[in-house]
Swiss-Prot record:
<feature type="binding site">
    <location>
        <begin position="192"/>
        <end position="193"/>
    </location>
    <ligand>
        <name>prenylated FMN</name>
    </ligand>
</feature>
<keyword id="KW-0288">FMN</keyword>
<keyword id="KW-0285">Flavoprotein</keyword>
<dbReference type="GO" id="GO:1901067">
    <property type="term" value="P:ferulate catabolic process"/>
</dbReference>
<comment type="function">
    <text>Catalyzes the reversible decarboxylation of aromatic carboxylic acids like ferulic acid, p-coumaric acid or cinnamic acid, producing the corresponding vinyl derivatives 4-vinylphenol, 4-vinylguaiacol, and styrene, respectively, which play the role of aroma metabolites. Not essential for ubiquinone synthesis.</text>
</comment>
<dbReference type="Pfam" id="PF01977">
    <property type="entry name" value="UbiD"/>
</dbReference>
<feature type="binding site">
    <location>
        <begin position="170"/>
        <end position="175"/>
    </location>
    <ligand>
        <name>prenylated FMN</name>
    </ligand>
</feature>
<dbReference type="GO" id="GO:0005737">
    <property type="term" value="C:cytoplasm"/>
</dbReference>
<dbReference type="Pfam" id="PF20695">
    <property type="entry name" value="UbiD_N"/>
</dbReference>
<feature type="active site" description="Proton donor">
    <location>
        <position position="285"/>
    </location>
</feature>
<feature type="binding site">
    <location>
        <position position="193"/>
    </location>
    <ligand>
        <name>Mn(2+)</name>
    </ligand>
</feature>
<dbReference type="Pfam" id="PF20696">
    <property type="entry name" value="UbiD_C"/>
</dbReference>
<feature type="binding site">
    <location>
        <position position="170"/>
    </location>
    <ligand>
        <name>Mn(2+)</name>
    </ligand>
</feature>
<comment type="subunit">
    <text>Homodimer. May form higher order oligomers.</text>
</comment>
<keyword id="KW-0456">Lyase</keyword>
<feature type="binding site">
    <location>
        <position position="236"/>
    </location>
    <ligand>
        <name>prenylated FMN</name>
    </ligand>
</feature>
<feature type="binding site">
    <location>
        <position position="394"/>
    </location>
    <ligand>
        <name>prenylated FMN</name>
    </ligand>
</feature>
């Protein structure tokens, strides 16, 4: 029997989830109009198995089933970050800290560019539709939230764009809404790389004929990396190869020269226009809101060809209150880049994380106190240095508050983070504002305020390290069970717990 490779093969990923009892195959007819979304939200919020909708109302034989919650959390007994771990081919019990550190280790590996395979070895080419045969509105595309502006086909697929000189190929995730039978509209915003590449076409007079591909069911490692804010000019495909330890098989598109993962479930291709726009949104996003009737003109994608596998499967993310892919992937992957940036910048940072409970708006940095004291700096100087490093780079684009904590805090435990936050900083006095940096337009307090016109500021660094800790060790007792009593006594209590009468 062939060994499953869930990081490279999307269908192997699904099989692994099934083998681990982390998949519910729903054969009852389900309506893609809100019912799919409702089931997904309940599964996310209860850390339940991923739903595979095999009988969607309005679906044809091969187009399509839906896999929901592909990177949602699951029960701790199964490894709560198991689905994310499987995206990388790691043990399902791998912790999020270990996942972040593994991604950093992979950056030291030799990049492996994709390998071109013949059409006969590309399952995504099983069925091919030309432009006149494409009817996007006939697909069972989910309408995910009440008051969304439309049906969102693209929530967990991968856009592929390439600069005109072909030196930089970008794989990325950005939402996409069906407009009509031939068109999709979606976010193409600065400073995201998809916009930078689109602008490079505009610079040569081709703003309305930018080649694109939109791929679904790509290698899970690829969809994970496409969420990362990696440096400008770096092609994600080579880094994916380093993670996998092998090159991603790719095949040429039907209507342009872009190369797409050969095992993709579905591939839509055509041209993007920055000059032709359509109202996009609103959409229930990563911060947990749909703001009714608040759409915006966005660039238009014209679909000119479509290819797909037998019994194609569409992976779907349904953003909202934590925890879903916009937190588990985007948040943790930004944290990975944040930790690397700290290392490159010489900051005494031990770990970085974006706690899910903060809806991907907070970045927590765990500071090595001995390293901090060696800098002979002040809280004010250090906060400014940290803010200048992060808020002026793409890594800090979605972040609105950076929180500095001491090295006694487990930043992957939100209970400890919020304890440090509320007890170790004085509001305003220990917060340094950065009013000249770019705001994140999707943050609700930006989009629903006058700041939406300037797109500046609303960001700060919060110092949750006691001032004296910048100069010397500062002893205090944490008043909890694990840290507040001698280890021998803690062990004794744990050993005798059932004898005391507890279960």
């Amino acid at each position: 029997m062939r060994k499953l490779n869930p990081a490279l093969e999307f269908r192997d990923f699904i099989q692994v989830l099934k083998d681990e009892d982390d998949l519910i195959e729903i054969t009852e007819e389900i309506d893609p109009n809100l019912e799919v979304g409702a089931i997904m939200r309940k599964a996310y919020e209860s850390h339940l198995p991923a739903p595979l909708f095999k009988n969607l109302k309005g679906a044809s034989k091969d187009l399509f089933s839906i896999l929901g919650c592909p990177a949602g959390l699951r029960s701790k007994e199964k490894g709560d970050h198991g689905r994310i771990a499987h995206h990388l081919g790691l043990d399902p019990k791998t912790t999020i800290k270990e996942i972040i550190d593994y991604l950093l280790e992979c950056k030291e590996k030799e990049p492996l560019p994709p390998i071109t395979v013949p059409v006969s070895s590309a399952p995504c080419k099983t069925h091919i539709l030309s432009e006149e045969k494409i009817h996007l509105q006939s697909l069972p595309t989910p309408y995910l939230h009440v008051s969304d502006g439309g049906k969102y086909l693209q929530t967990y697929g991968m856009w592929i764009l390439q600069t005109p000189d072909k030196k930089w190929t970008n794989w990325s995730i950005a939402r996409g809404m069906v407009v009509d039978d031939k068109h999709i509209t979606g976010l193409v915003i600065k400073p995201q790389h998809i916009r930078q590449i689109a602008d490079s076409w505009a610079a040569i007079g081709k703003a309305n004929e930018i080649p694109f591909a939109l791929c679904f069911g790509v290698p899970p490692a690829a969809i994970l990396v496409s969420s990362m804010p990696i440096p400008e000019g770096v092609s994600e495909s080579d880094y994916v190869g380093a993670i996998l330890g092998e090159s991603v098989p790719v095949v040429k598109c039907e209507t342009n020269d872009l190369m797409v993962p050969a095992t993709s479930e579905m591939v839509f291709e055509g041209t993007l226009s920055l000059t032709d726009t359509h109202l996009e949104g609103p959409f229930g996003e990563m911060h947990g809101y749909v703001f009714k009737s608040q759409g915006h003109p966005c660039p238009l994608y014209t679909v000119k060809a479509m290819s797909y596998r037998d019994n194609a499967i569409l992976p779907v993310s349904n953003p909202g209150l934590c925890t879903d892919e916009t937190h588990t992937l985007i948040g943790s992957l930004v944290a990975t880049e944040a930790k690397e940036l700290a290392i490159e910048s010489g900051l005494p940072i031990l770990d970085a994380f974006m706690p899910y409970e903060a809806q991907a708006l907070w970045l927590i940095l765990k500071v090595d106190l001995k390293g901090l004291q060696a800098l002979k700096t002040t809280p004010e100087e250090f906060c400014k240095k940290v803010g200048d490093i992060y808020f002026r780079t793409k890594v800090g684009f979605i972040v609105h508050e950076i929180i500095l904590v001491a090295d006694d805090i487990d930043i992957f435990n939100f209970k400890e983070v919020i304890w440090a936050y509320v007890t170790r900083h004085t509001p305003v006095a220990d917060q340094m504002a950065f009013d000249d940096v770019t705001s994140f337009p999707l943050a609700p307090f930006v989009s629903q305020s006058s700041r939406s016109k300037t797109m500046k500021g609303g960001k700060c660094v919060t110092n949750c390290i006691f001032r004296q800790q910048y100069e010397r060790s500062f002893d205090y007792i944490t008043c909890n069970f694990e840290k507040g009593y001698p280890k021998g006594l803690v062990d004794k209590v744990n050993e005798n717990w059932k004898r005391y009468g507890y279960k």
